[in-house]
Amino acid sequence: MRSSVLSLHPDRLLPADPGTRAIARRLYAQVATLPIISPHGHTDPAWFATNAPFANATELLLVPDHYVFRMLYSQGIDLDALGIPRADGTRAAVDPRAAWRVFAEHYTLLRGTPSALWLNHVFHDVFDLRIRLDAGTADHYYDHITAALQTPAFLPRALFERFNIEVIATTESPLDRLQHHAAIAASGWQGRVVTAYRPDPVVDPEHEQFAGALQQFGALTGEDVLSWDGYLRAHRQRRAFFAAHGATSTDHGHPSAATADLSPVQAQRLFDTVVRGEATPEQAELFRAQVLTEMAAMSLDDGLVMQLHPGCFRNHNRQLFEQYGRDKGADIPMRTDYVHALKPLLDRHGNDPRLRLIVFTLDETSYSRELAPLAGHYPSLLLGPAWWFHDAPEGMWRFREQTLASAGFYNTVGFNDDTRAFLSIPARHDVARRVDSAFLAKLVAEHRLEEDEATEVAIDLAYRLPKQAYNL
């Protein structure tokens, strides 16, 4: 069967109604080429430090992208057949071309998903491909992309510049020595790559690496991390180290949004239980909750913006986790409480405008009921954009619809791409800019906004708000 033409319609994601679409076109034209602010994500800083060529199409576009391979896994495709690394660092002996062929044969599984939007954008605009990916074009795609990746124009730094990225934030453990960020800073290259402090391995007693990570934390900082005061000093030390390497934010991926405000005596007693490895699930939750409030206090001192990404049941598939480890597409959204969960932290610090806490959710039912009213009241609280399972066009639209009334636009922070898939970053930002243009065009068409106001909001959402929210 002959492969079909790959094209990107200039009006994709814009309204079907001709009048509203015309407004959206004008709004989108004002934001389409703005620089990209990428304030939160998971790209590898080694890419930009070494500027080495990406290996091949499979290693770049398939292996790191759990959005993609989770869909294939759901249809019975073994992750070994895709070359996904196992938990012990080994891989099945699968040829990258063969893995790509499997992906191409099943590319139809992504129809209508945001992954298809992003990948088609990458294929069309980054690699200049004009036929669709399928079983018949798999080798053509693999050869074309892999050959391009060996050329100077496709080195990581060249792509960073081509994508018009003004700044990108990576996310590192407190145990990371940040040697790649140091190398970038020393290289003379003008691309701005900053880090973010993600202390989960030394904050979550239920993390499989917690005991060993805590030991390393102490060795790295020289602090007595088996005492509560020493543990907090170690965090302050590492936060300062991260800030010296460009960090403007911290990130916390907790099962819930729980916070606590224990006395020092209560905190020490709880910490003693944790370090002995005797914490119950309830005590582990209380410990994470207390550390969040401590992190907020530290942010008042050092100015780092807090991000909270709660409400995900991590590694739901035990067998897959044991075989392949974390971040393999088996994380599932959960119902999440914010009103009660955040109250201890907000009682302590919520009225201080020096604190900036950006809250995300995978529970869309909380948008209008809890999060928008909270952000529309507390000067310390901002709403992160539609996240992960909800960064599809439909999810972005629902986010705007359900938060606008109580939080407005200016208690939100623009867009985060939050991705490991480097080449998809322009596509993800383009989708967000198109959806916001469409949403704003509807408000203009309904005479709720003047077009000049909508234009200013569109620019703010695409560029100014993320810079402002993250101190970039």
Swiss-Prot record:
- The intrachain disulfides are none
Answer whether the UniProt record assigns the keyword Hydrolase to this protein: no
Question: Which pathway does the database say it acts in?
Answer: Carbohydrate metabolism; pentose and glucuronate interconversion
Segments forming a coiled coil? none
- What's the EC number here? 5.3.1.12
In the UniProt record, does the keyword Cell division occur?
no
Domain of life of the native organism: Bacteria
* SUPFAM superfamilies, sorted: Metallo-dependent hydrolases
Name any one GO molecular function: glucuronate isomerase activity
- Top enzyme class, one word, equals isomerase
Annotated GO biological processes are: D-galacturonate catabolic process; D-glucuronate catabolic process
**Keywords in UniProt for this one?**
Isomerase
Reactions the enzyme catalyzes: D-glucuronate = D-fructuronate; aldehydo-D-galacturonate = keto-D-tagaturonate
By its UniProt entry, which InterPro entries does this protein fall under? Metal_Hydrolase, Uronate_isomerase
What HAMAP family has UniProt attached to this entry? UxaC
The family line of this record is:
Belongs to the metallo-dependent hydrolases superfamily. Uronate isomerase family.
Name of the protein in its database record: Uronate isomerase
Per the UniProt record, the source organism is Xanthomonas euvesicatoria pv. vesicatoria (strain 85-10) (Xanthomonas campestris pv. vesicatoria)
